[in-house]
Amino acid sequence: IWDEPVVVSARDTEEAARVPSPQKRSQPLCSCNDINDKECMYFCHQDVIWDEPVVVSVRDTEEAARVPSPQKRPQPRCSCNDMNDKECMYFCHQDVIWDEPVVVSVRDTEEAARVPSPQKRSQPRCSCNDMNDKECVYFCHLDIIWDEPVVVSVRDTEEATRVPSPQKRSQPLCSCNDINDKECMYFCHQDIIWDEPVVVSVRDTEEAARVPSPQKRSQPLCSCNDINDKECMYFCHQDIIWDEPVVVSVRDTEEAARVPSPQKRSQPLCSCNDINDKECMYFCHQDVIWDEPVVVSVQDTEEAARVPSPQKRSQPLCSCNNMSDKECLNFCNLDIIWENVDTSADPEFLG
C-alpha cells in the first residue's frame, strides 16, 4: 500500500507493480551475513509470507532515494543477458553506477506479493561474477524452468543429498561440449559452486542406471580433465557406446556385481600384459568365462572413484582385440603417459 514507489530490491517498473510474485516460499531466498542489514533481510525474505507489508530499509524513503549506497563496488555484481531488463540491470549494478536510486522493484505491495512472475525463462537472466554469491546466482536463475528435479550423478544419491561434497575443486571436473546442457554443466561444476548438493538432473538413481538413455550421441557429452576419474569418464561417454547399460567400470556397485552381463563373447575383450593383474583379467574376460560376475578391483568402489590411479605406466595395461572398441581402448591405455605419440599407427584412435 505504498503511496510512493519504494526502492528495495529488483522487481520494479510501474508495469511490474501490477504483476504478482511467482509463489510463496517456506524458506528465505538467501541468508544475510549481517542480520542487521535490513535491506538484505527484506530481499532474502520478500517472498516468504508477510502478514502485513513491512518497511524494512532506509533506502525506501523519499529522503533515502537521494542517498547513495554506503559503499561502492568496483565491478558489477553480475552481468545481465538482456541489457534492456531494467530490473536485472538495477540488481547487478545497484552498488556501482547509480547516482540516484532507480525505482525497480514491485514486490512491495500486499497485492503484488500474491502475483507470480510474468513468465519462465529457458536461459539464465544474467551471469554472476562471483558464483559463490548465492543471492546473485538465485536472482539470475530464478525464472528458469526445471521440468522435474532429476538425479543425475552418483554424487547425488539420497545419501549424498545430505552430505556435502568431500572437497572443493579449483577447476571443473570436465568441460561440456554444449555449454547450454544444464545437466552436463552441473555435473562438471558440481564440486566448485554448490555448498549443498542440488538435485538437478536425472540419470543417477539405481533405477535409472539400468535404463538406456533416450538417444545416442556421436560425440561425448563432455571431456574429462582427469581421464582416471572413472565416474566422469562414464558420465561423459555414457550415451555413445552402450546399447544397454553394461556393468564394467566404477559403477560396479555391490548390487550390480550380482547382475550378469547382457551377452557373452566367444573371445576375450582384450589381452592383459600382466596375467596377475586381476582387474585387467576381469575386464578383458568379463563376458566370456565368469559364471557370476566377480568384484575384483578396489578401484570400483565409490571411494576409489575419487582416488587417482596409484601410478602411471609406460606400457598399456592390455591389448584390445577390436581397435574400434573405445571402452576397451580407454581401459587398457588409461594410465599411460603420452609424451611423444606416433600417430601413424592408428590416426583415428590416437587423434
Swiss-Prot record:
It comes from Atractaspis microlepidota microlepidota. Residues 6-341 are annotated as: 7 X 48 AA tandem repeats. GO terms for cellular component: extracellular space. This is Long-sarafotoxin. The keyword Disulfide bond applies. One of its GO terms (molecular function) is toxin activity. It is found in: Secreted. GO terms for biological process: intracellular calcium ion homeostasis; regulation of systemic arterial blood pressure by endothelin; regulation of vasoconstriction; vein smooth muscle contraction. Belongs to the endothelin/sarafotoxin family. The keyword Endoplasmic reticulum does not apply. It holds the Pfam family Endothelin. Keywords: Cardiotoxin, Disulfide bond, G-protein coupled receptor impairing toxin, Repeat, Secreted, Toxin, Vasoactive, Vasoconstrictor. The record marks W2, W50, W98, W146, W194, W242, W290, W338 as: Endothelin-receptor binding site. Residues 6-29, 54-77, 102-125, 150-173, 198-221, 246-269, 294-317, 342-351 form a propeptide. It comes from the Eukaryota.
